[in-house]
């Protein structure tokens, strides 16, 4: 059926079925409206509770004095009244007239700008002025340097030098150093060599050759006891690789073994492991004992 009650030609007319569907739709709409009304009532109750909480907060904080300095950058500087008084005056968002160009607010910024003008060099035609004693701030350098007026224009000592780790000089002694110069590193060549080069076999070979050359004139003094015709082996040991000299370490003289197996804190781990005399005799004795 259509709106006027006439039967619809396209659909068969069922009066009881169509009336039941309308009733069901009306009931659902009433149920939804009732739920919405209940939600509105609950929201009104929540609003009342919030108003009571706000009034209690106002009563508790009425004894507090919230007046702040005028140069504080907060919205609380406008007024120290409660939220209810603000709502009655001009709405909850009425902050009044904020004048940010007052002298009290800009006092700190102008002082900072004047400090920058004093600390920076002038851009005059005559050139930068010489630093006057007592006027510019003294900047303490970071690597143990001395207080130098008007910024770090003198280079600091190198962090690897001994000057950076040594104690500061006396108050009366001020080192005269020109800009651009650096302190010479006081590390010895041997320490610097072992720190930069982990493979120091060439230096060991030269030291062993120097030791053999130094001990060469002492060997003929011992030779007359063995025989006059036996040639001295000193000239044949002058040219020898570092590996062979290390393998023949147990057969060297006690003075040579002391010099070869020197104890130095600057040697690398590989250098010490190759220069120490390994206990080959102990393993041979164990093998003989087992046989």
Curated annotation (Swiss-Prot):
Keywords: Coiled coil, Synapse. Belongs to the INSYN1 family. Interacts with GPHN. The keyword S-adenosyl-L-methionine does not apply. Component of the protein machinery at the inhibitory synapses, probably acting as a scaffold. Inhibitory synapses dampen neuronal activity through postsynaptic hyperpolarization. This synaptic inhibition is fundamental for the functioning of the central nervous system, shaping and orchestrating the flow of information through neuronal networks to generate a precise neural code. This is Inhibitory synaptic factor 1. It comes from Rattus norvegicus (Rat). The gene is Insyn1. Residues 30-63 form a coiled coil. Residues 201-213 have a biased composition (Acidic residues). It is found in: Postsynaptic density.
């Amino acid at each position: 059926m259509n709106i006027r009650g006439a039967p619809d030609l396209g659909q068969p007319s069922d009066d009881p079925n169509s009336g039941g569907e309308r009733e069901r739709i009306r009931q659902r709409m009433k149920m939804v409206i009732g739920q919405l009304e209940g939600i509105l009532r609950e929201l009104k109750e929540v609003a009342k509770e919030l108003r009571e909480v706000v009034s209690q907060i106002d009563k508790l904080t009425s004894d507090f004095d919230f007046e702040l300095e005028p140069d504080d950058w907060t919205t609380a500087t406008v007024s120290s009244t409660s939220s209810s008084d603000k709502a009655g005056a001009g709405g909850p968002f009425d902050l009044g007239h904020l004048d940010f160009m007052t002298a009290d607010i800009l006092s700190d910024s102008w002082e900072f700008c004047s400090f920058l003008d004093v600390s920076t060099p002038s851009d005059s035609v005559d050139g930068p002025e010489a630093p006057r004693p007592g006027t510019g701030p003294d900047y303490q350098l970071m690597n143990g340097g001395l207080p130098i007026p008007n910024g770090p224009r003198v280079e600091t000592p190198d962090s690897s030098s001994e000057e950076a780790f040594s104690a500061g000089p006396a108050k009366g002694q001020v080192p005269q150093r020109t800009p651009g110069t650096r302190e010479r590193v006081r590390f010895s060549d041997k320490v610097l060599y072992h720190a930069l080069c982990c493979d120091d076999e060439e230096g060991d070979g030269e030291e062993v050759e120097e030791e053999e050359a130094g001990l060469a004139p002492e060997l003929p003094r011992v030779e007359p006891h063995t025989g006059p015709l036996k040639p001295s082996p000193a000239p044949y040991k002058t040219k020898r690789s570092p590996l062979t000299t290390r393998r023949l370490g147990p057969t060297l003289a006690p003075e040579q073994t002391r010099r070869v197996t020197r104890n130095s804190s600057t040697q690398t781990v590989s250098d010490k492991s190759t220069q120490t005399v390994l206990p080959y005799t102990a393993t041979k004795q164990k093998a003989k004992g087992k046989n």
